[in-house]
Amino acid sequence: MSDMSATHGVAQPWLASYPPAVDGTTPIVAKPVYALLDDTAAQHPGNDCVDFLDKHYSYAEIKRESDKVAKGLQQIGLKPGMRLGLFLPNCPYFVIFYHGALKAGACLVNFNPLYAEPEIERQIADAEVDFMVTLDVSQLLPKLDAVLTKSRVKSVIVCPMAQQLPFPKNLVYPFVMRSVHARMRIDSRHIAYKDLVHNDGAYAPVEIDPATTVALLQYTGGTTGVPKGAMLSHANVYINAIQSKRWFYTVDSPQAKTIGVLPLFHAFAMTCVMNWTLAVGGCMILEPKFDTLKLLRLVHRKRPTALVGVPTLFNALLNFPQFKDYDLSSLVFAISGGAPLPVEIRKKFEEE
């Protein structure tokens, strides 16, 4: 492999360290981020895109819902460049609104679902958020409602948790999970998901320059101070997904299945779970929260090909007493990010 850039003739000595199968020289033509979803939906419409708590969503379904979200947002007044906040755990609505809002021309702002009211209020003000999206659950909606009167937010779109569950869980959820259900207020600032997407999905296309149009404000972790919103263009996010596709070449196929237990509101999981999976046409198996036993059972039962984690996750798996009782042989590769992975953990995980 040449160590010269294919486009600029600039020396790139790091290419000599790339594995032979990794293409580090062919230029990537940037597209709007939502092309990751739309391109695959055109090629493999019937393939599973999302598996959430055993309910499966095809690429055609996720695209159709994202188109309806885009039109619905435009109908309630969202203009290109306006900020829309996602206050959601890992779930189908995250994927739908992420791409639907971008189609409508929005700039996304990811919110940590664990944020307390002061943190939510601060980020809304700092990012100048106009619209928010959340679930009708007690851990989320009441916190957002508490800051709504003090914020600039025009509308809160409330998504029903029960609707994304498989039968019969979707029917019994309101009764069995009454303690975690939150009722949506009936007023002009709250919009039910069913009302937002009650349209034909024919949204007005928005002109996007991938190199200059900001796709999202990704807030930093705040470990060294107050979290700051980093501007990521459509090109930044799209190209990063295609770069991941080139590096994870051993599972570059529509048969890829990725475990999505890391939160999608973080840049790492956003890229390596959601956008990479869309780029290869695979299926993301989304979990709203991490639990060691649940994750082991999930890998054993669902047979994923990829596991995206952080050092603490891999350490928790290895230290689980019944770790060896579960079959993880379907995994073609595992990737760790967020912090350096100790060599001993990597070696032990590969050996086990």
Predicted regions and their residues:
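Flexible, non-catalytic linker and terminal segments flanking ANL/adenylate-forming cores
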Residues: 1-30
